[in-house]
């Protein structure tokens, strides 16, 4: 009751939009502020969105959308030395809020109800867990449309490029005097940087052949490029109190990992219809991926589907059966795994729940490498899922009664056991 507050959330937004003769635009601003039930916790988020579209000529149009979001979160200390360990453990007879959290004249020596855990009030002032995220995503496009001066042909071509990029940074710090870090403090800085770029080209063609026949065809190309980076900094034993920073740590350890992968795909789709009664669709996609072994980086997956609407037949048009359809389909879906060439990494060792890390590299100016504990299969193939489906849909009495039946089956080929783990037995210094 004395420790917890009432959580509050405030949200504000502003939107301005206008339609012009051949253009439109929209601007949105937003903010969310949150105070947590623990006084040291909360969140602030700001977001901006801008979009615009314009018709350049009778055939050409263009537009863009851009979004930016920034989020800052102050979190409660968790894990083995969490805030609530002393809050819930203290009996009503112990005045946790009234007794000073530290010794008079020395703010880095705690008055602890439970000696193995930090005083909750002291921890709110000296231990900080934060999370900061900045994200930008958006796209820009250009499209071309024409009917070739006829009523039965239409062509629509569109090219769009987009990006989704974000960074998330975490800081988990225990101040000088905390029971975590041996009494001299500990800090972890870690996070992600991720940027995904997308290029998409589609060409859509509609042909109204005659009163009975119709045809639609789609061709396209897609390129996806993803760049990721993970970093980690760990430091212990601050030189002096009051500055929870990695540069204040006498012992430091850093790690960094980067990934890059690219997918290039070509796809097509052809659909034919007859009297709004018979439908046939063929699709196919060829993908080339970078995150597979060199000899298995391309794969093709097609599909075919057909439908027959029985109630379009004159003999079956009545007031009892409103709609009756038979459908059948076959499809393949390809899925690439995650493949890495074997490499070496710096080992890490745990010392148990209540002990410090026994060995930390670099040690006395020397680092160490061991074969990574995950072995990837050099013969890995893209996983292929084949599915078969047969079904029927029937509606009766103005859709008062409906019946639907589907039988489907899936078979997975080259199911990916992508990697196995083995004990690390060798080290190289």
Residue ranges of each PLM-predicted region?
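Generic secondary-structure transition motif, activating predominantly at the C-termini of alpha-helices
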Residues: 4, 91-92
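A short hydrophobic/aromatic micro-motif that marks alpha-helical segments and, especially, helix-coil
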Residues: 36, 72-73
């Amino acid at each position: 009751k004395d420790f917890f507050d009432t959580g509050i959330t405030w949200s504000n937004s502003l939107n301005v939009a206008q339609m012009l003769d051949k253009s439109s635009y929209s601007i949105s601003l937003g903010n969310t502020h949150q105070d947590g039930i623990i006084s040291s916790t909360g969140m602030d988020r700001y977001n901006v969105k801008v979009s615009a579209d314009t018709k350049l000529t009778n055939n050409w149009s263009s537009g863009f959308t851009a979004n930016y979001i920034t989020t800052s979160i102050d979190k409660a200390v968790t894990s083995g030395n969490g805030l609530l360990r002393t809050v819930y453990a203290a009996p009503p007879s112990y005045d946790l809020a009234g007794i000073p959290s530290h010794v008079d004249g020395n703010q880095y020596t705690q008055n602890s109800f439970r000696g193995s855990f930090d005083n909750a009030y002291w921890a709110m002032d000296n231990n900080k867990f934060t999370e900061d995220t900045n994200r930008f995503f958006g796209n820009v496009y250009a499209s071309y449309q024409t009917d070739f001066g006829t009523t039965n042909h239409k062509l629509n071509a569109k090219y769009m490029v987009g990006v989704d990029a974000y960074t998330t940074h975490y800081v988990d710090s225990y101040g000088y005097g905390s029971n975590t870090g041996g009494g001299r403090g500990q800090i972890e800085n870690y996070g992600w940087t991720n940027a995904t770029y997308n290029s998409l080209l589609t060409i859509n063609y509609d042909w109204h052949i005659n009163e009975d026949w119709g045809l639609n065809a789609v061709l396209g190309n897609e390129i996806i490029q993803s760049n990721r980076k993970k970093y980690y900094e760990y430091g212990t034993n601050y030189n002096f109190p009051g500055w929870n920073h990695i540069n204040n740590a006498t012992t430091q350890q850093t790690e960094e990992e980067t990934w890059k992968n690219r997918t290039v795909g070509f796809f097509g789709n052809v659909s034919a219809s007859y009297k709004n009664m018979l439908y046939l669709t063929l699709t196919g996609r060829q993908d080339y991926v970078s995150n597979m072994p060199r000899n298995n980086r391309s794969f093709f997956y097609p599909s075919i589907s057909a439908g027959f609407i029985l109630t379009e037949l004159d003999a079956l048009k009545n007031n009892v059966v409103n709609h009756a359809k038979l459908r059948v389909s076959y499809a393949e879906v390809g899925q690439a795994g995650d493949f890495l060439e074997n490499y070496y990494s710096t080992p890490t060792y745990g010392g148990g729940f209540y002990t410090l890390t026994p060995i930390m590299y670099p040690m006395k100016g020397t680092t160490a490498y061991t074969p990574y504990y995950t072995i990837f299969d050099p013969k890995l193939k893209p996983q292929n899922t084949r599915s078969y489906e047969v079904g029927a849909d029937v509606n009766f009495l103005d859709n008062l009664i409906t019946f639907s039946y589907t039988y489907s089956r899936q078979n997975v080929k080259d199911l990916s056991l992508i990697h196995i783990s083995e004990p690390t037995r060798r080290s190289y210094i």
